[in-house]
């Protein structure tokens, strides 16, 4: 089911490409056509790609050579993945980071750049339209203090960051 929902999200993103491109262009100044053909199209392709991998995650039973002994791999989600994105191609970043997190069964908290937050907010709404469960994708807004609080939160299990070198240093503390 998860694969179908993430694939549906890719389709919904494609259906709303003009709207998403207009939002991103209004905030970062990149021409709408470039945003539509590059960022938004890549966002949908990334989601399609990760949706196709959902049924391929697994492990191997490794023979141990000892009677009655069993060795196995159990793939489990991390839990909550924080996704911090930059202002220049927010749609591309969201698709490339949220896609694998959802594909592996994680919940996501997206913290977009304060300079380009509208695409992430609309993405979260489109997640609901595509059928993702409530709470699977969340968006928090704010500056560095919000990002720092998110990264330091004990309920956040993994962090994916794209941004400046200085901001990266802050995130990695």
Where are these regions (language model features)?
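Glycine-rich loop-to-alpha-helix module at the N-terminal edge of alpha/beta enzyme cores
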Residues: 1-57
């Amino acid at each position: 089911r998860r694969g179908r929902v993430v694939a549906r999200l890719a389709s919904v993103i494609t259906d709303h490409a003009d709207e998403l491109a207009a939002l991103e262009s209004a905030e970062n100044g990149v021409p709408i056509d470039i945003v539509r053909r590059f960022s938004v199209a890549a966002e949908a392709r990334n989601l399609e790609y990760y949706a196709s991998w959902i049924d391929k995650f697994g492990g191997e039973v490794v023979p141990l050579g000892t009677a009655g002994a069993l060795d196995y791999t159990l793939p489990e989600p991390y839990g909550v993945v924080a996704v911090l994105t930059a202002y220049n191609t927010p749609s591309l970043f969201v698709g490339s980071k949220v896609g694998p997190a959802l594909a592996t069964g994680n919940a996501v908290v997206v913290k977009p750049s304060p300079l380009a937050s509208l695409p992430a907010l609309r993405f979260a709404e489109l997640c609901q339209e595509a059928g993702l469960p409530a709470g699977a994708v969340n968006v928090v807004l704010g500056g560095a203090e919000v990002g720092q609080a998110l990264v330091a939160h004990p309920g956040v299990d993994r962090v994916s960051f794209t941004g400046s070198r200085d901001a990266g240093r802050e995130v990695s503390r």
